[in-house]
Amino acid sequence: MRGFRWPPPPDGGPRTWGPGPGAPRTGRPALPEPETELVDTPHDVQLERLVTGVGEPVTVFAHGFGNGIATTRPFGSAVTGRRVFFQFRGHGRSDVPPGPWSYLDLARDLRAVADLSGASRAFGASLGAGALCRLLVESPDRFEKLVFLLPAVLDRPRGPIAQQRLTDLLDAVAGGDASAVADVVALELPPSVRNTPAGWSHLRQRLDQLLRDGLAAGLADLVEQSPLPDVAALAGVTAPALVIGCVGDDLHPTHIAAELAAALPAATLHVYDRPGFAWTDRADLRERISTFLND
């Protein structure tokens, strides 16, 4: 890791890795990662979990492909009650059971964590939104409130650009090359953020996590899959839902968010006008999610 040379720190210092003289000399230091636990599930897959907050209600948060607890926590920062974050199989310290894997397997992971935690509300981002959709086909009345952030796929496979991005991430992490991983992860950031202290801190955190924990090869099974046989299968879900999409995101097309909102009888759709809104419109996004869930 000390030989890492990409990208340059935002203050123009030497391109070296770590907390030494090459690290950014501006911006806040990254907070230490909280202590997580491994929980047993009825389907014999141990999953990594973090519980924050106190009281009721309880909200479970499901992360995106190649992401995890750390990148999902900010979305729940203003949500009241207990907040339950976890890692799907193949991510973090969670188990890597034999494959092949499907969205039904992810739905079982999500359902197990929700049941063990007593969650009455659910948040799903990207891959997590797909897993939540699959869970709702089996149990349409499981949750009282639902948030879907950047749904990526419903009843048709991802497009070729999105599939290639996910494959590139898996290949880079498997190869263990920090520069290759950084090239892929940097695409998550809007250009205006990439060479700032905040962007550098995010990139460093993501690289630390991905190169430490890796991503299971079984995740490749999911790249070409879709979670639903037909989006019409969600017609029985009557819980209030918030669906959040954006314009211009190759991994999360606007029409997927619109189709999901149309399929859910009690859904509200909000579409941001550009990718990277989790950075550029962070306060608005946090308020939008918390207002919906806290109401």
Q: How would you label these PLM feature ranges?
A:
Residues 124-132:
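Gly/Ala-rich beta-loop-alpha elbow adjacent to hydrolase catalytic centers
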Residues 157-159, 175-223:
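Conserved alpha/beta-hydrolase catalytic His-Asp/Glu region
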